[in-house]
Amino acid sequence: MELFPARADIVMPAGVAGPDPVSFVVHAFVVRDGDDIILVDTLQQPGHVDLIAEALARAGSGFEAIRYIVLTHHHPDHTGGLAEVVSRAPQAQVLGGAGDARVIAEATRVAVDVVGAGDSVLGLEVVPTPGHTAGHVCLVDPGSSTVLLGDVVGNIGRLERGPAQFTENADQAEATLHALADRGLEHGVPSHGDPFAGASRSIAELLRTSA
């Protein structure tokens, strides 16, 4: 698996996450498997399609090579660019978790097929990771022991849980962290922040040291 991130800088308006505007970074990921591409998430705005195009170019590819678009969850910073991406990659099959696929489809007017436990996408294992949203999914590459984490955790200076104010079910989110801590994964790639080594060990340490 070869991974090429697309980074977008977002400003959340005052009143959404508190009284003041909030700035943050979110990533989508171009995953190359030979000549085929999986796009994981689509950033927030239609204009962010150019950032995805740049990541595709770094992968030596283009929109015509996208076979699958996998959406980790329904939040708009991950799905807002979907319709524009699909307009450039109409051949791509769009996939999301069972708890989120309908929400995404209604918000974007794009058909979303459901994936879940036991499914794989070009060799990447689909892992349901509910909590942040009901249908949140991660992708695991068994060959490199890498997990694409979506918003299960962030790593901006330090490893942290997904923001509480945007987490739909805190108990499920904790159970998801425990499940990932037990998997022995080596490399973690969150949507917010930097990749980190010792993915499962680091998540276990997060659980041990913070409530």
Which residue ranges define each predicted feature?
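A short catalytic or substrate-binding loop motif that flags glycine-/basic-rich loops and adjacent residues
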Residues: 21-24, 129-133
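Residue-level signal for the nucleotide or nucleotide-sugar donor/cofactor binding architecture
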Residues: 80, 124, 167-168
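Metallo-beta-lactamase
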Residues: 37, 44-46, 128, 134-210
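Zn-dependent metallo-beta-lactamase
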Residues: 1-36, 47, 178-184, 198-201
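Short, well-ordered beta-strand micro-motif
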Residues: 30-32, 66, 140
